[in-house]
C-alpha cells in the first residue's frame, strides 16, 4: 500500500472505519457534469416566502423557516435554478425535488429535516448543500440525503442519521468543504464516483463508510466506480465487508481493529501528536484515516 505514514492507534476504543469500497468491474469511464449554480442570490432580502402549499414551480430563492409540517416539493422547469434558504427551519417530512435544473440547500441557520417513511431529501436533480449553518437530517428507514443525479457538499455542518445510506448519489458525490458527521447509516457515503477535496468527514456505518458502486439501476453500467480523496480529513469506522482504499489522492492509513461500542480510540502520529480521537457508536473491525499530513514513509 502506498502513501502511508506510521500512525499509532491506541485502542482504548474508537469509532472509525471508513470501509472504502469500490466495485471491481473495470470498463470505460464516463464523466458526468457537476452541479452548476450561478447568478443566484442567497440573501434573505432577495428570498421569497415558501408557497403556502409547499410546492415550488419556478426558479428563485425561497426562505424556509419555523415549523414546517407540509411536504416541500420542487417541481420547476428543467432549466430552473432553485435555492431553498433554510434558516431556523424544522421540516417534519421529506423534501422532494421532482424536477429542476439545479437545486441548492443553503443552510443559513440551524435547521433540521426529518422523515419517517422516505428519504430525508429526495432529489431527481443536481443537488448542492452550502452555507454557514448546521443541518440535521434524519431518515428512519431510507437515505438521509439522496440524489438521482449529482450531489455536492461545499459548506455547512451536517449531522446525518439514516436507516439506510447517509448521503447517496446515483452519479457523482463530491465533498468540497464543510463538516459532516454520519452518526448512523448502513453505508455512509455512496455514489458511482465519490470524491473528497476538502472538509471534515466522520462516518459510523454498519457496512461501508464509503461505497463506490454500480448497484443502483440508474447508474451508467459502462462507468468505472472510483473513490478519490484529494484533501480534508476523512475518518470512518465500520465492519468493512469489502474494505478497499482510494486508488488516487492524498495519503491514508487503514487498520484492522477490535472495537466495542462506546470504546474510544486515539490516533497519533510518529511524534505522538494527536490526529483524532473518537468514540465508537457500535462495534467495529476497521479504521480508516486520511489527512493531507499523511505521506509515504
Enumerate the language-model features and the residues they cover.
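A composition-driven surface/loop motif
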Residues: 5-297
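N-terminal secretory signal peptides that target proteins for export/translocation
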Residues: 1-3
Amino acid at each position: 500500500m502506498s502513501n502511508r505514514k506510521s500512525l499509532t492507534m491506541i485502542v482504548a476504543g474508537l469509532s472509525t472505519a471508513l470501509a472504502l469500497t469500490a466495485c471491481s468491474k473495470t470498463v470505460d469511464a464516463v464523466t458526468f457534469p457537476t452541479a452548476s449554480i450561478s447568478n443566484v442570490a442567497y440573501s434573505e432580502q432577495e428570498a421569497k416566502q415558501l408557497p403556502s402549499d409547499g410546492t415550488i414551480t419556478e426558479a428563485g430563492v425561497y426562505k424556509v423557516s419555523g415549523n414546517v409540517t407540509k411536504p416541500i416539493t420542487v417541481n420547476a422547469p428543467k432549466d430552473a435554478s432553485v435555492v431553498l434558504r433554510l434558516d431556523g427551519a424544522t421540516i417534519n417530512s421529506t423534501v422532494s425535488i421532482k424536477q429542476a435544473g439545479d437545486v441548492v440547500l443553503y443552510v443559513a441557520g440551524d435547521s433540521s429535516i426529518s422523515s419517517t417513511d422516505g428519504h430525508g431529501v429526495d432529489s431527481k436533480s443536481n443537488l448542492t448543500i452550502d452555507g454557514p449553518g448546521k443541518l440535521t437530517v434524519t431518515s428512519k428507514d431510507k437515505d438521509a440525503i439522496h440524489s438521482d443525479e449529482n450531489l455536492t457538499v461545499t459548506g455547512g455542518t451536517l449531522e446525518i442519521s439514516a436507516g439506510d445510506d447517509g448521503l447517496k448519489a446515483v452519479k457523482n458525490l463530491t465533498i468540497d468543504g464543510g463538516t459532516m458527521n454520519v452518526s448512523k447509516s448502513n453505508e455512509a457515503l455512496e455514489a458511482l464516483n465519490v470524491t473528497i477535496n476538502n472538509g471534515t468527514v466522520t462516518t459510523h456505518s454498519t457496512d461501508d463508510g464509503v461505497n463506490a458502486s454500480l448497484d443502483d439501476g440508474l447508474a451508467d453500467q459502462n462507468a468505472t466506480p472510483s473513490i478519490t480523496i484529494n484533501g480534508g480529513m476523512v475518518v470512518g469506522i465500520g465492519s468493512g465487508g469489502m474494505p478497499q482504499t482510494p486508488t488516487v489522492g492524498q495519503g491514508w492509513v487503514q487498520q484492522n481493529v477490535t472495537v466495542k461500542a462506546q470504546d474510544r480510540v486515539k490516533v497519533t502520529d510518529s511524534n505522538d501528536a494527536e490526529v483524532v480521537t473518537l468514540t465508537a457508536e457500535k462495534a467495529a473491525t476497521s479504521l480508516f484515516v486520511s489527512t493531507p499530513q499523511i505521506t509515504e514513509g
